[in-house]
Regions:
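Conserved hydrolase catalytic core segment
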Residues: 100-143
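N-terminal cap/lid segment of alpha/beta-hydrolase-fold proteins
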Residues: 3-23
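Alpha/beta-hydrolase
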Residues: 38-40, 65-67, 131, 242, ...
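Active-site loop/oxyanion-hole signature of alpha/beta-hydrolase fold enzymes
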Residues: 27, 64-105, 109, 121, ...
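Conserved HGGG/HGGXW glycine-rich cap/lid loop of the alpha/beta-hydrolase fold
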Residues: 22-72, 107
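Catalytic active-site module of serine/aspartate enzymes centered on a nucleophile-bearing elbow/loop
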Residues: 274-313
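Flexible "cap/lid" subdomain of the alpha/beta-hydrolase fold that forms the substrate-access gate
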Residues: 129-269
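Conserved catalytic-core motifs of eukaryotic protein kinase domains, centered on the activation segment
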Residues: 48-50, 73-79, 140-141
Length: 313
């Protein structure tokens, strides 16, 4: 896709009114069913799918959107729980006249969104792709494997609150250590307009408030785990994509090994959510597979659509 075409992700696409006060930004491309719905991870907007959506749209109708408080969507009610996020998405799809069934694609924490959607609205979902996401009980897993992880996580959230304060005061600028650490740096795979948009959005306090709330909500939900999730999605066609290149948080060396082993176990747990679950490790990709290896995500969606013909009636 030419950079001129990718630049459309740097501006509002189609703002959909979901109630009397709020609008959700949505990008709808292509034709053909089932409709593919793309759900990004932390701080992600439609532009994280810029290298995937147009290619998928050659064969399917493909929808990407900005969650409330991010991109060109209006803020939503707090806290930003997965339930509220899915409610916004379903309202936007209905208001835009985009009917199910859907193949849901969730990247990173967007996987919590897609799984919640499928569990509570199974008749609307015909397949799922999870792109380097984590298990529902990841908080419990990491706490058990790496005791230093929880204090490191709390410190991370406190740092984000400070960054939000800097954004509010206008001091989040080049030269500040937190600017270099937390404001998205340019991605070589994206054109200048998209990298500029990613940077500019991160200078707004609402961006950080939304991100912090989403992190806290997912942490709280995953800490309440303990539910046997095996085959929880039944025979839903499911492909799990796992990054082959991992970066661990700052932990003691012995805990880093345990942390990474727990991530690996979590990937296998995701596969077990469906009796039709399969997994592919993308050896040369980091966490953002949709940016590093977009063809892997495209192939996974095609695989899931092919699997839909194997479901029990």
């Amino acid at each position: 896709m030419a950079n001129a075409d990718l630049d459309l992700y740097a501006r509002p696409q189609k703002r959909i009114r979901i109630n009397r006060r709020r609008w959700i930004n949505l990008l709808d491309l292509g034709e053909g069913g089932p409709t593919v719905v793309l759900c990004g991870g932390d701080r992600s907007t439609t532009l994280i799918w810029a290298r995937v959506q147009s290619e998928l749209a050659r064969d399917f109708r493909v929808v990407a959107y900005d969650r409330a408080g991010l991109g060109f969507s209006d803020p939503g009610a707090f806290p930003r729980t997965t339930r509220r996020i899915v409610g916004d998405l379903r309202a936007a799809l209905r208001a835009a006249g985009i009917e199910p069934p859907y193949v849901l694609v969730g990247a990173s924490n967007g996987g919590f969104e897609t799984r919640w959607f499928a569990r509570h609205h199974p008749d609307e979902v015909t397949g799922m792709v999870l792109v380097d996401t984590t298990a529902d009980d990841w908080t419990l897993r990491q706490q058990a494997a790496a005791p230093s992880w929880r204090p490191a996580w709390r410190n991370y959230l406190n740092q984000l609150r400070y960054v939000a304060d800097c954004a509010r005061s206008g001091s989040l600028r080049p030269g500040l250590a937190e600017y270099a650490q937390y404001v998205p740096q340019p991605m070589a795979q994206l054109p200048e307009a998209l990298n500029d948009r990613r940077r500019d959005e991160a200078l707004t306090p609402g961006y950080w408030r939304t991100h912090i709330s989403e992190c806290e909500a997912i942490e709280a939900a995953s800490a309440a785990g303990g539910v046997d999730t095996r085959a929880l999605l039944g025979d839903l066609p499911l492909v799990v994509l796992s990054a082959g290149v991992r970066i661990a948080p700052p932990l003691p060396n012995d805990e880093v090994r345990a942390f990474l082993a727990t991530l690996e176990a979590g990937q296998e747990a995701l596969v077990a959510l469906s009796t039709l679950g399969v997994r592919h490790c993308i050896a040369d990709s980091g966490h953002n597979i949709q940016i590093d290896r977009p063809e892997a995500v495209i192939a996974a969606v095609t695989e899931v659509v092919a699997m839909t013909g194997t479901r029990a009636s």
